[in-house]
Amino acid sequence: MSKNDHRITHNKSDKDNLDDDFSLFRDEVKGVKKLRQDTILHAPNRNPKQKEIRRTEREASDNDFYFSDEFMPHLTDEGPTRYARSDVSKYEVKRLRRGVYVPDVFLDMHGMTQQEAKRELGAMIAYCLKENVHCACVQHGIGKHILKQNVPLWLAQHPDVLAFHQAPLEFGGDGALLVLLSIPEK
């Protein structure tokens, strides 16, 4: 036997062999249908911006949880609308009254229903906590006194509200409240 005897020789070129292989394969799989994949469920691709919006809405509704219409905190009837938690010094309330704290966030509630106002108030508090805003101004207006009466009651129930006071004239006077919030340490 010579060296060349065990070598296989082809009469056709490699391209012809490849074409034959493909045609044989096609003949064998003719009539086969693709199986539908049903074991792995792929989550739809979500836009990161949509995730952020959903998270913000969830945080706002979580903060809305604190606002009950049934609970009546003890607020003084004399003088301007004001409130301070027991662990907040009177000096802080005085600084709010004088306008020493300048609000970084303003919420205008004019024309809102009570439910919209609760939701927006919760969203504002969530935003302030997220952005480390210590003072905010809530403009409830005067109108029929519905929001003017309820906003202080809602704010007094929230655990992150340290104090609030009727705003000085430059921030809305009798139709607004300056709110002092506790910022969590990181």
Curated annotation (Swiss-Prot):
Gene3D superfamilies in UniProt: 3.30.1370.110
Residue span(s) of domain Smr: 107-182
E.C. number(s) listed in UniProt: 3.1.-.-
The keyword RNA-binding is annotated on this UniProt entry: yes
Highest taxon of the lineage: Bacteria
UniProt feature, compositional bias: Basic and acidic residues: 1-16, 49-60
Enzyme class label: hydrolase
Keywords: Endonuclease, Hydrolase, Nuclease, RNA-binding, rRNA-binding
MF-aspect GO terms: RNA endonuclease activity; rRNA binding
InterPro entries (alphabetical): Smr_dom (IPR002625), Smr_dom_sf (IPR036063), SmrB-like (IPR022990)
Pfam families attached to this UniProt entry: Smr
Disordered as annotated region, ranges: 1-20, 41-60
Summary of subunit composition and partner proteins: Associates with collided ribosomes, but not with correctly translating polysomes.
Primary role: Acts as a ribosome collision sensor. Detects stalled/collided disomes (pairs of ribosomes where the leading ribosome is stalled and a second ribosome has collided with it) and endonucleolytically cleaves mRNA at the 5' boundary of the stalled ribosome. Stalled/collided disomes form a new interface (primarily via the 30S subunits) that binds SmrB. Cleaved mRNA becomes available for tmRNA ligation, leading to ribosomal subunit dissociation and rescue of stalled ribosomes.
Family to which this protein belongs: Belongs to the SmrB family.
Stored HAMAP family: SmrB (MF_01042)
Protein name: Ribosome rescue factor SmrB
Protein source organism: Vibrio cholerae serotype O1 (strain ATCC 39315 / El Tor Inaba N16961)
Source species taxonomy: Bacteria, Pseudomonadati, Pseudomonadota, Gammaproteobacteria, Vibrionales
Underlying gene: smrB
